[in-house]
Amino acid sequence: VTIPAGWQIDIGLEIHAQLNTQSKIFSGASTLFGQSPNSQACAIDLGMPGVLPSVNAEVFKKAVQFGLSIGAMINQESRFDRKNYFYPDLPKGYQITQMDHPIVLGGEITIQTSNGTEKIIRVTRAHLEEDAGKSIHDFKPGYTGIDLNRAGTPLLEIVSEPDIKNAEEAVAYAKAIHQLLTYLEVCDGNMAEGSLRFDANISVRRQDAEALGTRSEIKNLNSFRFLEQAIHFETERQISVLDAGGTLIQDTRLFDPDRHETRSMRSKETATDYRYFPEPDLLPVMLTAEFIEEIQAQLPELPGKRAQRYQTAHELSASDAALLSQDRRLGDYFDEVLTFSSNAKSAANWVRGDLLSKLNEHELGITACPISPKHLGEMIQ
């Protein structure tokens, strides 16, 4: 979709990544997906009188892993706040999140644009918070129920600067975040199960305007395709309103993929509407330099550096290097093949060609591959 002449778009994404811990962020309840409604919500998740939250240390490790991998600053003093609002799936009447002291500050993600060039998208912050429950509509005709299994599930909310200029860049950025999170194994990235959700903040302005336009936030997009479509339709809506001499209001919207439109849910809230204040039941969490350094030392070789190594050390093409480094387990398998074969190009052809084709045919991942790296490497050699 071409942006009309004389207009420019500014997009910032908020990505909600469910951290793949076995228990919730402030309680010992299980995070296992697909269980019967309300079977995994304990008294802490429900906010019952007299209960106190306690922090799951694993969420800090995973958040620091992500922050270090994007070159961010890790906030050694991490605090939690209450975000107050009413919604049926929020039994406490507030969400525990991080407002003033997020665990991750800054950082950047490099994406490939449609014309083949690289572009840096700045990350503003990433903070820890708890998820809410969810509504189940028409479980009985005319009724809506509440399932609180998801309440208290740990989330890492990753907020970008408005550096994204079109829907294609937004999808490229979202895919890069998805790849990194799954590569680090801090999130399973399963969008069908709600493990990764996108909120898109979109505004348009005249080409010669310096100030950002009035933005709308489109909530809870759960696929790359819906993200792209929602941005296209919202951009068209905003430009048509302004072209007709109308005025835009800052609001929160939902995307209807069947009607190909975005619809207003409510006027956009500001921070004062949520009445943030420090969470009185949780002390500040102090991360030592040793803790951060230990995580840094344990970080795997990241996809970009791995692809670069494949190109320089093994003379693979950029496309082969990117494919073999996009999945951590696939890259590990290929590296092990190379310990038994000195012919990297032939090994790459076998792995990305026949091997992956057969695995896909039988719906198997690389970790379930019946052919060992040693066997394949020795055969190639």
Residue ranges and their predicted role:
Residues 55-60, 95-101, 170-173, 227, ...:
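Hydrophobic (often cysteine-bearing) scaffold residues that line and stabilize catalytic clefts
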Residues 1-78, 83-85, 143, 164, ...:
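N-terminal, positively charged regions that mediate nucleic acid binding
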Residues 19, 110-118, 204-208:
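Short acidic, glycine-rich loop/turn motifs
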Residues 2-10, 48-50, 146-163, 168-381:
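Charged, compositionally biased, marginally structured helical/coil segments
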Residues 21-29, 134-137, 208-211:
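Short acidic, Gly/Pro-enriched loop/turn segments at secondary-structure junctions
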